[in-house]
Amino acid sequence: MFQKVEGIVIRTTDYGETNKIVTIFSRELGKVSAMARGAKXPKSRLASVSQLMTHGHFLIQMGSGLGTLQQGEIISTMKEFREDIFLTAYASFIXELTDKQXXDKXHNPYLFEMLYQTLHYMCEGVDPEVLSLIYQTKMLPVLGMRPYFDTCAICHQETDFVAFSVREGGFLCSRHAEQDQYRIPVGEAVHKLLRLFYHFDLHRLGNVSVKDSTKKQMRLVLNTYYDEYCGIYLKSRRFLEQLDKFQI
C-alpha cells in the first residue's frame, strides 16, 4: 500500500553505504519511518528530500514493518538550519523531543502544526531559545503532564508566586514556598511567561523579547520538571548546554 503524506524529516540514520532511514513527522500519520534507498548518493533523487528538517510531500510504500520512501517533493528545505549552528542546535532539540515522545503512526495534527509553526518561526528569525521554551511548555499536556501554572500547587489560590516546586508539581505562593526546601526561586516574569506559553495559540505569536536571566530560569524550571516526570535523555539538550557554557 502506498501512502502520501505531508511531513517534516525529524531524524535520519545512515544504513549501509548508500541508504538512510528517515523518520518523518507527518500531518496524516504522525511519526513514520521509512528506508530511503540510495539517499546517501549525491545524484540520488531522494538525496535532497531526505535531509533533516526538510518539509515536503512524501510517497511511502507501507508495510508491516519499516516502510520504503519511494519519492518526495520538497515544500521547503528550511536551509536556515544548515547555515547557523545555533538554529541547528535548537531545531535538533525540537525534533528530538518530538521524536522521543511520539509513538509510531499516532495521528496528531495538533503536534504536527505546532512542530511546523515553531520551525517556521525559527527560519523567520524569531528567538530560537524562546521558541524552544514555548515548545517545551506546550509539549507538557501532549505528554500528559499538567503542572500548576495558574494557581499555587498547595493552596490553589491565584496569588503571588515566588518559586517553582518540582515535588508539588507547580508554582508556590509566598505563604507556602517554605514547604519545599528544594524549590526553585523564580521571578514574576517566569510565572507570567510560562503560564502564557502554556495557554496561548502559537499562531498568534508576535514580537517576543525575553531577558537572558528570565530565559535561564525558565529553562531550569522546565528541564528539572521534565527530568523528574518524563525521564528522557536528549543528546540535543546536552549540546545546547555546551553551547551556553562555552558561549559559542
UniProtKB/Swiss-Prot annotation:
Family annotation (InterPro entries): ARFGAP/RecO, DNA_rep/recomb_RecO_N, NA-bd_OB-fold, RecO, RecO_C
Record keywords, A-Z: DNA damage, DNA recombination, DNA repair
One Pfam family of this chain: RecO_C
Protein name in the entry: DNA repair protein RecO
Family: Belongs to the RecO family.
Stored Gene3D superfamilies: Nucleic acid-binding proteins, Recombination protein O, C-terminal domain
GO biological process terms on file: DNA recombination; double-strand break repair
KW tRNA processing (keyword) present: no
Keyword Protease: no
Its biological purpose: Involved in DNA repair and RecF pathway recombination.
Originating organism: Bacillus cereus (strain ATCC 10987 / NRS 248)
